[in-house]
Amino acid sequence: MSIVKDMSLAPSGLQKIQWVRDFMPALSGIEERFRKEKPFAGLTIAVSVHLEAKTANLGLVLREGGADVHLTGCNPLSTQDDVAAAMTHLGVDTYGVHGVTPQEYEDLLVETLKCRPHLIVDDGGDLISLLGGRCADLGERLIGGCEETTTGIHRLIAREKAGILPCPMMAVNDAKAKHYYDNKYGTGQSTWDAIMHTTNLMVAGKTVVVAGYGWCGKGIAMRAKGMGAHVIVCEVDPFKALEATMENFQVMPMDEAAKVGDLFVTATGCKDVIVDRHFAVMKHNAILCNSGHFDCEVDVAALAAEAVERFPRREGIEGFRLKDGRILNVLAQGRLVNLAVGNGHPAEIMDMSFAVQALSLEWLAKHRDGLEKKVYQVPDEIDDQIGRVKLAAMGLSIDTLTQEQKDYLAGWEA
């Protein structure tokens, strides 16, 4: 039994789903094979990913593989109500409503887990947290699962070290087919797409501060530079800071960057990146947003406590008027901007990421009997297969090593 906002929205969602399906060729090829082989026959899969059209396509592919699929979101603001209605119309149990409270969001996750899944797809680690706590009784059939994000993998590794990981988990985010493309090119494009659409402001000529120079931060900084911004990078890792410097970005601590930035984007996966001491020195009408998974990177609660007025400025933008008259603008309540006020990554990018998810779930199902409760890396053969399929779909080809070259690379003699 689904829980969605309004079934009359289904036609709009169906259009969105069909559109992205036409631009996800790697997943289409997997779907064709799954339809014949049914690798998930008799298995139930719970999927907690941003509930929009690309995720819907993944759900349909898994269903073609024989799975009983149950979909939910992974963020209170990223669910698209028309897509949730469309998936319900297509016969997939779906639990998602845009704009729910944190408690309502957790309740939707719990409803999803009542299917007692054999496999899970997690994005940020919320399902696995529930299965290791409040919903431990619903994990009795668990074979394993996949985690989509850097943040989620950090949580998984911490659980593994503490000996409380409920089941084997695949670190999908660490796959080459995922983080090289999704994190860099997907986040780079979708973050700026959301910022520009929401603010309707120029990027060129602005001083943009990017907090974090991991794969996501690299993409965000690269696209800002390409659109004519002066980019400052804030980092805690000396080598990432050096890398940013070599790419001709200015590097400085946030305490200094806060004084000169026009637009701030966090992408660290950590908490308290921009806090009250930074708000105190920011320019009037500075813009703040977050592209990390959780809403703890910009301390919006501290900003609200300092403000004498909190008011809407545009859809997706709140203004915070401070005692000295300055206004600071926060996008999407400090939640991940590219999905809370945007459409997420391009379909062609998620084609690769969700291909990794689909094949990793298949791998878990096949190897279920020999797995330990730990974090596994995606096998190289899955990564390579997806890379080659994507190249072929783009009409590209590459060279192949000869046997002599393979022997040379494997040997120690010249």
Name the predicted role of every residue range:
Residues 2-40, 71-79, 84-206:
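Glycine/serine-rich phosphate-binding loop and adjoining beta1-alpha1 elements at the start
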Residues 11-24, 40-44, 48, 52, ...:
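Adenosine-phosphate binding glycine-rich loop
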Residues 48-55, 75-79, 125-127, 215:
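Gly/Ser/Thr-rich loops at beta-strand to alpha-helix junctions
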Residues 49-67, 182, 186-260, 266-271:
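Glycine-rich phosphate/diphosphate-binding loop of Rossmann-like nucleotide-binding domains
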Residues 66-67, 92, 137-141, 165-167, ...:
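A short helix->loop->beta-strand "cap" motif at the edges of active sites that frequently abuts
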Residues 73, 119-124, 135-151, 270, ...:
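ADP-ribose/adenylate-binding Rossmann-like module
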Residues 113-114, 203, 255-261, 279-283:
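A short, aliphatic-rich alpha-helical micro-motif
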